[in-house]
Regions:
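A short, charge-rich alpha-helical start-of-domain segment used by transcription regulators
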Residues: 14-38
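Structural recognition of an alpha-helix C-terminal capping motif at a helix-to-coil junction
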Residues: 38, 52-59, 72-84
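Amphipathic, Lys/Arg- and hydrophobic-enriched alpha-helical face
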Residues: 29-47, 64, 131, 183
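Short amphipathic alpha helix immediately N-terminal
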Residues: 29, 133-152, 183
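Arg/Lys-rich amphipathic alpha helix in sigma70-family domain 2
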Residues: 66-69, 80-100, 120, 183
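Sigma70-family region 2
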Residues: 18-19, 42-45, 55-73, 92-94
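DNA-recognition helix of helix-turn-helix
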Residues: 87, 138, 147, 157-184
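Internal acidic/polar
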Residues: 6-7, 96-124
Length: 190
């Protein structure tokens, strides 16, 4: 939670950005770079791709500041704009993947290892790295559902897929991540 002082500083920068002051844009960019980069990394296949998404996101933020209503949380508004920019980027540069490989993976049984214990032993960076290994569409559905709180209906509308396809991607992503986490845990305990 941000302090009143912090909120006042951000509100001042937003007002200055609306007046076209590039110095304020630079301050806003520097201040929110890390948290917005983290948002983009959830949807990107690499840090370079996340950087591209982030740049497009900030461009949309600065272009649409007149649409931000000062009554709400600026960071929540910015996060939504950056998330949508990342999704637009993903659609624009969508990568194809082999459906048969994903179907085989979804049907692979998972060994009897304590999954929750395995997750608890992992760092956030390790979890992000595993999520980034998911195919683009699967990663996008997973992030929207788990991190952004979208429903399958909202995901379907956003990505132009059916709700059942969204659910399939989420289930397959969970199974794949679970398998990889258990595999990593086995390697860590050896």
């Amino acid at each position: 939670m941000m302090s009143e002082r912090e909120n006042a500083k951000i509100a001042r920068w937003v007002d200055e950005c609306r007046q076209g002051r590039t110095r304020a844009q630079h301050k806003l960019f520097r201040h929110f770079y890390a948290p917005m980069f983290s948002v983009c990394m959830r949807y990107a296949g690499s840090p370079e791709e996340a950087e591209d998404m982030l740049n497009e996101g900030f461009l949309k933020v600065f272009s649409n500041l007149d649409k931000y209503e000062d009554t709400g949380s600026f960071i929540a508004w910015m996060r939504k704009v950056v998330t949508n920019a990342a999704l637009d980027y993903r659609r624009k540069y969508a990568m194809k993947f082999e459906t048969t490989e994903l179907e085989q993976l979804a049907n692979t049984p998972i060994a009897g290892v304590d999954y929750n214990q395995a997750v608890a032993q992992m760092s956030a960076d390790e979890l992000v790295a595993l999520i980034q290994q998911l195919p683009p569409m699967m990663r996008t559905v997973f992030n929207l559902f788990i991190f952004e709180g979208y429903s399958h209906a909202e995901i379907a509308a956003q990505l132009d897929i059916t709700e059942s396809t969204s659910a399939w991607h989420l289930n397959t992503a969970r199974n794949r991540l679970k398998k990889e986490i258990i595999k990593m845990n086995g390697e860590l305990t050896k």
